[in-house]
């Protein structure tokens, strides 16, 4: 039986002294209120009301039970209020710090139109995984290799000066004998300090004979960008980031690099709900493409013609590069 609503009918009828008026106060019909009170009496094994007169009056047992019934109804009402508040509370989502404020704002706005309230929290790759594991967030966009990803973001190298080539070969950064320094560096932002990106670049660095210091992880994107703007260094980033920062972007000649992301949640229903309603908007916020990055064999980015120039602020028709500096 529904003890809470039976107690609600019992309390309202006792307060109003009438089954008809009490039922209306409890927002139920008189017949439903009568059945619920009768069911409660049967459950307790004692009568709650004396029905001998026209106005129902409490029996001694009913007077004893009324305070507890009131407490139960109050607690149930509080529980309902808490449930409504919890349903309307924003869903906290851990997202990469590389996402721009504008794109995250658009994501939050679009989610509201689809009956999901998001509270986005930016964090690095390891921290996002930990936030999901400890359930400090409801869901998170986690970094994975592109071949395991739902969304992929192509990566390349961007600099402050406009290059004359379609691709940047990491080998071209090696200082030749007698060549004046300093050596040009590749600046890696924290979002890309993961084995499937920084680890692959480190192996390439060693293979082509660069110095260890020529590949460095910056403490944040601001520091990395400042280093690039004040030197000939290059930033590992996506085409969208390069465009936002006013840098010239090219794919890496020797490697096809991409960030990969999956949506994870402590409760799978949360992940399914977000994927089902927000997948294209999450992809846009990440700067993701349907492909997994530019192809070093052609220099073309995802969705780009092999004959067109990829990347941000690019000039069409730039020449191919061998091992010349970018």
UniProtKB/Swiss-Prot annotation:
Region (Disordered): 289-326
PROSITE patterns named among the record's database cross-references: HTH_LYSR
SUPFAM superfamilies given in the database record: Winged helix' DNA-binding domain (SSF46785)
Family matches, as InterPro entries: Tscrpt_reg_HTH_LysR (IPR000847), WH-like_DNA-bd_sf (IPR036388), WH_DNA-bd_sf (IPR036390)
Protein name as it appears in the record: HTH-type transcriptional regulator BlaA
Domain (HTH lysR-type): residue spans on this chain: 1-59
Any one GO molecular function term: DNA-binding transcription factor activity
Reported function: Positive regulator of the expression of the gene (blaB) for beta-lactamase. It binds to the blaL-blaA intercistronic region.
Pfam family, one: HTH_1
UniProt similarity note: Belongs to the LysR transcriptional regulatory family.
Keyword Transcription: yes
Keyword Ribonucleoprotein belongs to the record: no
Superkingdom in the source lineage: Bacteria
Record feature DNA-binding region, as residue ranges: 19-38
Keyword set, alphabetical order: Activator, DNA-binding, Transcription, Transcription regulation
Skewed-composition ranges (Low complexity): 295-326
């Amino acid at each position: 039986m529904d003890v809470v609503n039976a107690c609600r009918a019992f309390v309202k009828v006792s307060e109003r002294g009438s089954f008809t008026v009490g039922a209306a106060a409890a927002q139920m019909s008189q017949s439903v209120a009568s059945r619920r009170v009768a069911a409660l009496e049967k459950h307790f094994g004692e009568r709650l009301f004396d029905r001998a007169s026209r106005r129902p009056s409490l029996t001694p047992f009913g007077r004893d039970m009324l305070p507890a019934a009131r407490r139960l109804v109050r607690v149930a009402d509080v529980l309902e209020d808490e449930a409504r508040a919890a349903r309307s509370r924003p869903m906290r989502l851990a997202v990469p710090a590389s996402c721009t404020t504008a794109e995250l704002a658009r994501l939050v706005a679009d989610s509201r139109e689809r009956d999901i309230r998001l509270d986005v929290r930016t964090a690095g790759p390891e921290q996002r995984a930990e936030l999901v594991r400890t359930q400090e967030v409801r869901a998170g966009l986690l970094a994975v290799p592109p071949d395991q990803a739902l969304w992929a973001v192509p990566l390349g190298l961007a600099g402050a000066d406009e290059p004359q080539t379609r691709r940047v070969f990491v080998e071209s950064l090696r200082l030749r004998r007698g060549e004046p320094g300093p050596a040009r560096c590749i600046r890696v932002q924290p979002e890309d300090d993961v084995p499937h990106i920084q680890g692959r670049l480190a192996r390439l660095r060693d293979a082509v004979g660069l110095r260890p210091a020529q590949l460095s992880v910056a403490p944040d994107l601001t520091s990395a960008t400042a280093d690039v703007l004040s030197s000939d260094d290059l930033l590992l980033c996506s085409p969208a980031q390069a465009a936002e920062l006013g840098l010239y972007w090219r794919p890496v000649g020797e490697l096809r690099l991409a960030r990969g992301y999956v949506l994870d949640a402590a409760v799978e229903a949360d992940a399914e709900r977000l994927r089902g309603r927000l997948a294209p908007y999450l992809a846009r916020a990440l700067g993701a493409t349907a492909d997994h990055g530019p192809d070093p064999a052609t220099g073309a980015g995802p969705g780009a013609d092999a004959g067109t120039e990829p990347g941000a602020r690019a000039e069409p028709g730039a020449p191919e590069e061998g091992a010349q500096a970018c």
